[in-house]
Amino acid sequence: MIPVLPPLEALLDRLYVVALPMRVRFRGITTREVALIEGPAGWGEFGAFVEYQSAQACAWLASAIETAYCAPPPVRRDRVPINATVPAVAAAQVGEVLARFPGARTAKVKVAEPGQSLADDIERVNAVRELVPMVRVDANGGWGVAEAVAAAAALTADGPLEYLEQPCATVAELAELRRRVDVPIAADESIRKAEDPLAVVRAQAADIAVLKVAPLGGISALLDIAARIAVPVVVSSALDSAVGIAAGLTAAAALPELDHACGLGTGGLFEEDVAEPAAPVDGFLAVARTTPDPARLQALGAPPQRRQWWIDRVKACYSLLVPSFG
């Protein structure tokens, strides 16, 4: 938690905006823009997706400030198990994607991609099953209840799923689906985009909580929610750079219990990053703070007009944070 909000000028003075090229289209984008803030405790990442309005993005700025200005919490483990992340690629590309996650025994597969079919999803999931023993899928709220019931049956015809992540958009839909299928349900957007992140569990709509540092407002906020949510937690990336991944690893390492692989291996989705990506070893990532490489910051710097867009965004989000600090 940020005890005192630093001056806006201090944030802008140490702000770096970068554009990271991606290996494949993910979440509909091929370049990931983030703003990085250097502070007395290290580096923080402000990477709210560009379509988010300031009211939603300000939590991401709070997270960046916390990481840059506050000491990290004590950790309980020095490495974190990660899942491979498989975008909505053709089945023939699955082997190439999984090769970036050496030793991973769990894979998260994107499904319900606009413009694709359930048959595409089945083919992709089954290709992953041939290479990785544990599979989970993420629909990003792309199905209605009836579609999700049908998809759950089709996707488990050739093997089990660890869970369905955010198969439907609303808590009510998740609760209904959970009553109708045997596959465990994980909630992501229903937690990180909700005014009340605990509502999904009170509604008995999820078996697992997927928590992300930046959208929830920082490491301390994530740990607070994890302590109160009463279901197992998976810490995941919000398509973070190496700086954001380090914050996610710290949060996962600080949890009292960690029963599932975490979605923190997404650095492999970038062609270039602000620091040398940590390579998974036997399916684990080491817990460590990350300092960007100055040469990479310069080489990956966003164009002037995009840098100004992020500066304006920081100012707008900062103004929304000020009232919280009296």
Swiss-Prot record:
Mg(2+) binds at residues 138, 165, 188. Its cofactor is a divalent metal cation. SMART domains: MR_MLE (SM00922). It catalyses: (1R,6R)-6-hydroxy-2-succinyl-cyclohexa-2,4-diene-1-carboxylate = 2-succinylbenzoate + H2O. Its EC number is 4.2.1.113. One of its GO terms (biological process) is menaquinone biosynthetic process. Pfam families: Enolase_like_N (PF18374), MR_MLE_C (PF13378). Pathway: Quinol/quinone metabolism; 1,4-dihydroxy-2-naphthoate biosynthesis; 1,4-dihydroxy-2-naphthoate from chorismate: step 4/7; Quinol/quinone metabolism; menaquinone biosynthesis. SUPFAM superfamilies: Enolase C-terminal domain-like. One of its GO terms (molecular function) is O-succinylbenzoate synthase activity. Coiled coil: none annotated. The active site is at 110 (proton donor), 212 (proton acceptor). Signal peptide: none annotated. InterPro entries: Enolase-like_C_sf, Enolase_C-like, Mandelate_racemase_C, OSB_synthase_MenC1. It comes from the Bacteria. Keywords: Lyase, Magnesium, Menaquinone biosynthesis, Metal-binding. The keyword Glycoprotein does not apply. Belongs to the mandelate racemase/muconate lactonizing enzyme family. MenC type 1 subfamily. Was identified as a high-confidence drug target. Converts 2-succinyl-6-hydroxy-2,4-cyclohexadiene-1-carboxylate (SHCHC) to 2-succinylbenzoate (OSB). This is o-succinylbenzoate synthase. The gene is menC.
